[in-house]
């Protein structure tokens, strides 16, 4: 690990604390701005099982205020931070005037990382963008009531409380989805992706437009840098998304 990354590296426990703080603040804001009006509640919980993932749970009765919960895995937070470190390390290690370096001429700029952030902020911003997007993805499932949609096309369940688990490509029995069930699974995942991206962009603009966050003359550069790092965060999530299980209970 190079010196720049080593200086901003966190211990696992500190990564967990940071993730809890970031998503806890978002949960608080959403409860005040959205759920309070409905008389409902959004809660955040963490799972210690060593798995890349997150899932959304809805445990409310018909006609009652929404009771939503998003569960995040600590391992997801840990690996995203480590991936962000490795990404920054890799980009700094590209030899000047090498073939890879020359590819950046296509964009008119060989700068690999935004210059408006220091080493610690680079990793931190990639991390925050990635876990925030995953959190918003799960909230997208809840807001669009994908549990109802998937349950309609999935296995039948009795009672007023839904207990089914629905995965990206598998039913709760770990049987591969096919046909209409697979179609509904794909569509709801894409819908949650859209919701997550929309919520994240709105949150990003809210922060950048805050005079206390960044001064006016620096706003464009900072916004551009944050968008760049958000895309990098999405790349850190690629493997997670391919292996992640989304439950809707």
Identify the residue ranges that each predicted region occupies:
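Active-site metal-coordination segments of metallo-dependent hydrolases
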Residues: 9-20, 174-197
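Long, well-structured alpha-helical subdomains associated
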Residues: 185-186, 194-249
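Short amphipathic alpha-helical leader/targeting segments
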Residues: 86, 154, 206-210
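Intrinsically disordered, low-complexity acidic Ser/Thr-rich regulatory segments
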Residues: 107-129, 174-186, 217-226
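Peri-catalytic and regulatory segments of divalent metal-dependent proteins
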Residues: 1-133, 139, 143-152
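Short, Lys/Arg-enriched charge-dense amphipathic segments
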Residues: 59-76, 143, 171-174, 233-249
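Post-HEXXH active-site segment of zinc metalloproteases
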Residues: 145-185
């Amino acid at each position: 690990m190079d010196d720049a990354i080593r200086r901003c590296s966190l211990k696992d426990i500190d990564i967990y604390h940071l993730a809890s703080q970031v998503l806890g603040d978002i949960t608080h804001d959403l409860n005040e701005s959205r759920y309070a009006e409905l008389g409902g509640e959004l809660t955040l919980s963490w799972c210690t099982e060593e798995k890349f993932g997150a899932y959304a749970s809805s445990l409310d009765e018909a006609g009652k205020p929404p009771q939503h919960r998003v569960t995040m895995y600590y391992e997801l937070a840990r690996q995203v931070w480590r991936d962000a470190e490795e990404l920054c390390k890799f980009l700094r290690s590209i030899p000047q005037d090498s073939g890879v370096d020359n590819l950046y001429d296509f964009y008119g700029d060989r700068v690999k990382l935004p210059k408006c952030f220091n080493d610690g902020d680079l990793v931190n911003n990639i991390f925050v963008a990635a876990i925030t997007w995953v959190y918003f993805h799960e909230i997208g499932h809840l807001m669009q009531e994908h549990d109802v949609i998937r349950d309609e096309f999935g296995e039948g369940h009795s009672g007023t409380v839904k207990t089914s688990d629905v995965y990206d490509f598998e039913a709760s029995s770990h049987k591969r989805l096919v046909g209409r069930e697979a179609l509904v699974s794909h569509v709801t995942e894409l819908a949650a992706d859209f919701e997550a991206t929309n919520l994240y962009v709105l949150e990003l603009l809210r922060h950048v437009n805050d005079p206390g966050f960044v001064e006016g003359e620096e706003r464009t550069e900072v916004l551009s840098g944050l968008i760049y790092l958000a895309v990098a965060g999405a790349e850190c999530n690629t493997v997670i998304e391919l292996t992640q299980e989304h439950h809707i209970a």
